Amino acid sequence: MKIFLRLTKKIIYQIIFQFFFLKFFFLKLFKNKIIIFDIDNTVANTWPSLLKKNMNEKERLSNLKPFENIVKLILNYNKSGEKIIFMSARDYKFYNITKSWIKNNCVKNFDLILVSNVHEKLKLLKIFKNKNITFYDDLSYSHENEVTLFYEDILNKLKELNNVKHIGYNELLVLQKKNYDKKI
């Protein structure tokens, strides 16, 4: 029975991924420049919430604190008319919570893509061969264990995508201190 449930979940996740894949594919038809933001530890200060006890996942995700300067950056992109996509490796059942969080904390005009794991982000980025992409993603994990680790395999593969400008962990730390009252 467990094997059947696991297999069913995997099939459902593949169907959902295909939906987001198609959504992403059609988005590429509209703009030449696309701005993509990860959410956890990029737009939202997520890792401290992982240390809190007695909080269910829905409540935890709903109460994340945004990084104020990154939100200002997003708002500047939005004012400039840029296409903004949020792409996060989160369970698909949190799609509506994630969408509400973005609307309440960042911007109203955006697209949201959820993937079941961080490696699927790379698959989606490869669709946009003829588009200029600015991709904000720390690509890190394990902060809550007092050691920050990185998805080195993805970081290396991103370097091969000439159309993708990756803004990573160190750059995001600098952006947190930058003033975004001026136009980009």
What are these regions (language model features)?
Residues 1-37, 183-184:
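Non-catalytic pre-domain segments flanking phosphatase-related domains
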Residues 31-33, 81-83, 130-133:
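Short coil/turn segments at beta-strand junctions that form active-site/ligand-binding loops
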Residues 32-48:
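Asp-based phosphoryl-transfer active-site loop
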Residues 38, 87, 135-136:
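Short hydrophobic segments within beta-strands
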Residues 42-44, 50, 92, 142:
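Active-site loop signature of alpha/beta-hydrolase-fold enzymes
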Residues 44-56, 100-106:
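Short, basic/glycine-rich phosphate-binding loops at helix/coil junctions
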Residues 56-85, 95-98, 118-119, 123-124:
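Short, acidic loop-to-helix structural element flanking the phosphoryl-transfer center
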Residues 91-184:
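C-terminal cap/substrate-recognition subdomain and adjoining C-terminal extension
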